[in-house]
Amino acid sequence: MTPDLLRSVTSARIFDLEQLRYAGAPAHPAHAPGFNYFLHRHHARGGNEARTGASGIVVMPEHSGTHIDALAHQAENLTLHGGIHVDEGVQTSVGFRKLGVETMAPIVARGVLLDVAGDRELEPDYAITPADLARAAAKVEIRPDDVVLVRTGYGGLWSKPEEYLRAAGVSADGSRWLIEKKVRAVGADNMAFDVISAERDPELNATLPGHILLLVRAGIPILENLNLEELAAAKAYEFLFFCLPLKMRGATGSPVRPIAIA
C-alpha cells in the first residue's frame, strides 16, 4: 500500500451498511423465521481450570437481514442467468452446482447513493419510477460498473417489522433504467428491492419483476435490507463500496456486512 493510499483510507469515514441481526427482525414471508441465535455453551463454575468458554449457534435463512442475492436465486421459466436450465444436474438437495454464491467475487467498486426519499416521504408500497431515480441521480453521476444503492427511507423502520415490510421499492421500469446504466450491482434499504406487495407484472408474468430483470436477464446481483441512513445524513452520494459474500457452496445468497468509505 502506498503512503498516499494509506493516508486517504485512514482519514476517510467508514459507513456500516448492515442492519442489526436480531430475533424478530423483519423477514420476508418466504424466508421466515429469520435470524435466531442460541447460546449452547455457557460460562459456568465447576471446571478444573480458570478458563471458561461460551459459544452459540446461528440459525437463519441465507436471505435474512442484510444480504446479497446470488444469480442462482431466481429463474425465469426454470432458466437461470446465461440460459442455464434448472434441472437435477444444477439444482440439488445441497445447493446449486452453477451460479451459487461461492462463485461471486468480492465487490470493490465505486458506489453511488440515489436518495429517492431525500426530499419526501415515500408512501407504503410506492413503486419508484425511472423519473424518481433520475431526479436522485442529479446529485451524482452513474458510471458503468458502479454499485447503485437506492434509499427508500424505510431502513429507519428496521425495528418496526410490520411497517418495514410495506416499504417502497423499485418498479420494473426502474430496474430497466438501472440495467441501461450497466451497473455492477444494485441494492436498497428494503426487503426485496422490488415492492413486495405489488401485483404480478403483466409483461413478465411475475411478482418481484426486478428479480427477473436484474438477476436472470442482466446478471446483476441485488443487495437487500441495507442501512443507508448515515450515508444519506452525511450526503455521501459517491464512495468506495466493499461487499464480501461468504463462500457457501451452492447457496443462493449470503449474509453480508457491506461498507462505504467516503
Model regions and ranges:
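Active-/binding-site microenvironments in catalytic and ligand-binding cores
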Residues: 1-262
